[in-house]
Curated annotation (Swiss-Prot):
Name of the protein in its database record: 4-O-dimethylallyl-L-tyrosine synthase
Presence of the UniProt keyword Transferase in the record: yes
Assembly and interaction partners: Homodimer.
Annotated metabolic or biological route of this protein: Mycotoxin biosynthesis
Family classification: Belongs to the tryptophan dimethylallyltransferase family.
Length: 448
């Protein structure tokens, strides 16, 4: 296996001549440039992904205070395990080759994020990918099934016996399908993704999370997604325990009642888990709702709740909602945002449940990708929010940092760099995360 060979030999790799960057792009890439002198890229696909995406990841870590040892460790992890899983490089004209990933709206198979926490000093870097095989989308691998298993199995040496795939296997069986089961049904170029994986780059070792999209399984089995998810949770009852199941059934009951009376029916899109011992894992149910008023957001966040939402957190959320979407202060809470006819329009939520509690932790993903003015206005709005809460470093550096990391275009030239600004309701307040599409296929990256 390629990843295993890389793991065994990474410290002895010979130096390679990587495409030179302009001096202005080199000035802040110290750890990446240092590694770049010694790492050998196995083919042009991994060369593209390393030179295009790894500098972004390195700068994101550097700008929020990761020391050089941590940066090096995580970049080596990215090089060894992740690069071979990003699929083929784009065509010379800058188009996907063989597989359109649902990870981002432009099909980039990678999403980067800064988790800012609730207060100063709580920030960390995360990223998510769709593992894509070399032959994904072809007759040899039409559903892109192979690479996710190669990646997950190959990660074992890096996780020092903490990797547990019990839940991965259960949810994979319950929520995804195979080429053999799907048969000759016609597939569109879009909507084929079934697996994402994500990594939290903590101080210690990265943490692995897996995500399952049941859309194809629903078609193959002629079963609504909601029923598939209920069956998957029931199959895990022995692993998750009674408290978890109480919370899930409460959430599911509330969703069904809301769907019966709502003009917009909430739709389950993704189920996520942590790849650790089931008793330490979480299940996260991702739901998209087409309602976009702030009142609708509050109603959705209350799904399955045993108590009302914290008033102070709701007030903070409304402030952030207005700042990043560029709404006036007097924008009515019951007014919908302008209609956007897109597959990912509306508002995305997740509901987190743990085996050790019957509590449900809600999270909202503010859909700035579709409803804000441009990426500069989003960045300025988020910086203002940070400033008002004493997160001085983030407030002062956020806009310039984005311009530095994503230098292929100006922030005020359009939307798409920010995918979401998310908020999790925690006991100490709102925990904010900003998510980014690296815009792998942006035309500016391919102009001579």
């Amino acid at each position: 296996m390629q990843t295993a060979r890389l793991f065994q030999g990474n410290l002895n790799l010979a130096a390679a001549n990587i495409r030179d960057y302009e001096k202005k792009e080199q000035r802040n890439l110290g750890v990446w440039l240092s590694l770049n002198q010694w790492l050998r890229l196995y083919d042009e696909d991994t060369r593209f992904w390393w030179t295009t995406t790894a500098p972004m990841l390195g700068r994101m870590m550097e700008l929020i205070g990761y020391d050089q040892d941590a940066q090096q460790k995580h970049l080596l992890f990215y090089y060894i395990y992740v690069l071979p899983s990003l699929g083929r490089r784009p065509s010379p004209e800058g188009y996907p080759t063989g597989w359109n990933s649902f990870m981002t709206d432009d099909y980039s198979p990678l999403e980067l994020s800064w988790d800012w926490g609730v207060a100063e000093g709580e920030s960390s870097v995360r990223f998510s990918i769709e593992p894509i095989g070399k032959y994904a989308g072809t007759q040899a691998d039409p559903l892109n099934q192979k690479m996710v298993y190669q990646l997950v199995d190959g990660l074992r040496p890096a996780f020092h016996h903490t990797l547990d795939l019990t839940l991965f296997d259960v949810f994979s069986e319950a929520l995804t399908t195979s080429r053999e089961k799907f048969g000759t049904r016609k597939l569109s170029l879009e909507g084929r993704s079934q697996y994402f994986v994500a990594f939290d780059l903590d101080v210690g070792h990265p943490r692995l999370k897996a995500y399952f999209m049941p859309g194809l399984k629903s078609i193959e089995s002629n079963t609504p997604v909601s029923e598939l998810v209920v069956k998957a949770m029931d199959a895990c009852e022995l692993h998750f325990g009674s408290l978890f199941m109480q919370a899930f059934r409460r959430l599911n009951s509330d969703l069904e009642a809301f769907s019966a009376t709502s003009y917009h029916r909430p739709e389950i899109e993704i189920v996520g888990i942590d790849c650790v011992s089931p008793v330490k894992s979480r299940a996260k149910i991702y739901i998209r709702h087409r309602g976009t008023s702030f009142d609708s957001v509050c109603r959705m966040l209350s799904m399955g709740a045993k108590a009302p939402l914290d008033a102070a957190s709701v007030a903070s959320l409304r402030e952030l909602w207005a700042l990043v979407l560029g709404l006036p202060k007097d924008f009515p809470s019951d007014q919908e945002l302008p209609s956007v006819p897109h597959r990912t329009s509306g508002v995305l939520y997740y509901f987190e449940i743990k085996p050790t509690s019957d509590a449900i932790v809600p999270k909202v993903y503010i859909p700035v990708r579709h409803y804000a003015s441009n990426d500069l206005s989003i960045a300025q709005g988020l910086a203002t929010y940070f400033e008002r809460r004493g997160q001085t470093v983030a407030a002062e550096n956020y806009v310039d940092a984005l311009s530095d990391i994503f230098s292929h275009r100006s922030l005020d030239s359009g939307l798409g760099l920010h995918t979401y600004i998310s908020c999790t309701f925690k006991k100490t307040g709102l925990s904010v995360t900003s998510y980014f599409n690296p815009e792998i296929y942006h035309p500016n990256r391919y102009r001579q």
